[in-house]
Design a protein with these regions (language model features):
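Short, glycine-/small- and polar/acidic-enriched structural segments
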Residues: 103-111
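Bacterial N-terminal signal peptides
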Residues: 9-19
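Exported/periplasmic ABC-transporter solute-binding proteins
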Residues: 3, 21-54, 58-62, 67, ...
Length: 264
């Protein structure tokens, strides 16, 4: 128990030190710390580069599951902006008084089945009941919206009871992807934005899951009250940038469907 406490304290010190260096006006920093849902990880690299080039404002992204970020924000984590994998988590934070503005949808996500093995994907989700498929990776449904929608898709096709014992859970989409790329799982249910990333698009094979099989994945962004301490102007600039033609074009490139008014 003592070792665990020491390790946790160590990582907290590192996190807060990085944050302080990036954003403390006393050090001349003008940075933003942004909580980024794991499905946006690769997309965000281009968003970050474009924003920093346009404004000179430095962004420090932290990637993880939306549910865990929400819990961290509720417990005082110093994030300025939160890009969630759904609207539920940022709306919850708004109701609890942790946000500066109301959440806004920046894009709509798509589920895909992805494999690095010889598994036949021609039958889609129904094919995952085959005995050749031993392990199926999904993000943890409790904290990851993409994991919840994967379960909804299984239930839509009436195969959940047949695949339930095959499921292995990643803490977020990022760990789910690791299970796929290392072949620790035969297939994984992940985000289309991942398989379209430049460093992933030629790896393995994938198919989309029919959107009628799961709830619409509306992904929201919100400015958090913490930003008002030192970075209100920078946070607003970044929030607005996400809905610019340039940023929305990047989201589209990575397979996100765009809000109607944000079509570039």
């Amino acid at each position: 128990m003592k070792i665990k406490s020491i390790v946790l304290s160590f990582f907290l010190v590192i996190f807060f030190s990085v944050y302080a260096f990036a954003g403390d006006p006393a050090t001349g920093g003008t940075g933003l710390t942004v909580a980024v849902a794991a499905n946006v990880q690769y997309t965000f690299e281009e968003i970050k580069a474009a924003f920093e080039k346009n404004t000179g404002i430095v962004i420090t992204p932290v990637t993880g599951s939306s549910g865990k970020f929400t819990a961290q924000i509720e417990n005082g984590a110093p994030f300025d902006v939160f890009l969630s994998a759904d609207m539920d988590y940022p709306q919850t934070l708004e109701k609890e008084g942790f946000t500066y503005n109301s959440p806004k949808v920046y894009g709509y996500g798509t589920l895909v089945i992805w494999t690095m093995t010889g598994v036949d994907l021609s039958r889609g989700i129904e094919g995952l009941t085959d005995s050749a498929v031993k392990k199926i990776a999904i993000a943890t449904p409790k904290t990851a919206p993409y994991g919840r929608q994967a379960v909804n898709a299984f239930k839509h096709y009436n195969v959940y009871s047949q695949v339930q014992n095959k499921l292995v859970y990643g803490e977020s989409i990022a760990q789910t992807n690791q299970f796929v790329t290392t072949k620790a799982a035969d297939v994984g249910i992940t985000a289309k934005s991942i398989v379209l990333a430049p460093n992933m698009k030629d790896q393995g094979k994938w198919v989309e899951i029919n959107k009628e099989a799961y709830d619409t994945i509306a992904q929201g962004v919100v400015i958090l009250k913490h930003a008002q301490k030192d970075h209100s102007e920078e946070a607003q600039k970044f929030f607005d940038f996400l809905f610019s033609n340039e940023a929305q074009g990047i989201f589209k490139k990575y397979g996100y469907e765009l809000p109607v008014k944000a079509q570039p």
